[in-house]
Amino acid sequence: QPLANALTEEEVSAVTRQLAAMPAPAPVPVHRSEMPTDAAQKIALQGAWERQIPACVSCHGPAGVGVGDGFPPLAGQSAAYLAAQLNAWRSGTRHNDPNDLMGHIAKSLSAEEVQAVATYFASLSGQEAKP
């Protein structure tokens, strides 16, 4: 925000126009009916319903590109960031989920699953998905 505070109204408008003109990435369909190749893909694409864990893409959109403000993008985020957020929900230190959807999911994941899912989504660019 310090940089944004230094901009004039005209510069803010110019940056806004430039960003608005950029094309949004087109989501690529994720073929969830195909067999995942590892446990991280299974959780990301199909979930672990026997443990009440929905597929990540059920809420976060095809290939984890995000859906509105409520379900941010996962694809292309750093694995360390994603793992840190999941671990914050696991430990109860993150509370910005009014219905505790992510808290329930994160607490149901093992430490290994947290790292694997974070690494999987970090490997996606947001424009590709490899089921």
Label every model-predicted segment.
Residues E11, A44-W49, P54-V57, A111-E113:
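C-type cytochrome heme-c attachment and multiheme electron-transfer modules
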